[in-house]
Amino acid sequence: MSEYKELSCLAYDLRKKVVEMVVSGKGGHIGGDMSVIDVLVALYFKEMNISPKNMDDPDRDRFVMSKGHSVEAYYAVLAAKGFFPMEEVIEKFSKFGSSYIGHPNNKLPGIEMNSGSLGHGLPVCVGMAL
């Protein structure tokens, strides 16, 4: 199977996981998730130098999800990459007391910063690069 086909199949499967998350959590921004999942899969599984094993490496790539309301897709990709168990995310998404909240939460492995307010990702990334 070609690399493109493998990534397309992964994105398709992760879309299903996003739907499971939204149903389990009784809410979410599913349209935004569906629009960004292909980009996240391509970045995390083809382009970026990032894994649960290299989070302390100063040369790792960093990703900031400024479009924080599409967090379900972000969680699905991070879970598929091995940062945390997929079933845990689906079960606990948007539940009281859970770390898997409706915007990226940097208390979770693989998430560089909290986000939600549109537009603050770019200046934060510039600061990280400096």
Model-derived features: positions:
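N-terminal hydrophobic or amphipathic helices/low-complexity stretches enriched
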Residues: 1-14
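Cofactor-binding active-site loop characterized by glycine-rich and histidine/acidic residues
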Residues: 6, 18-21, 33-130
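N-terminal capping segment at the start of a domain
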Residues: 11-27
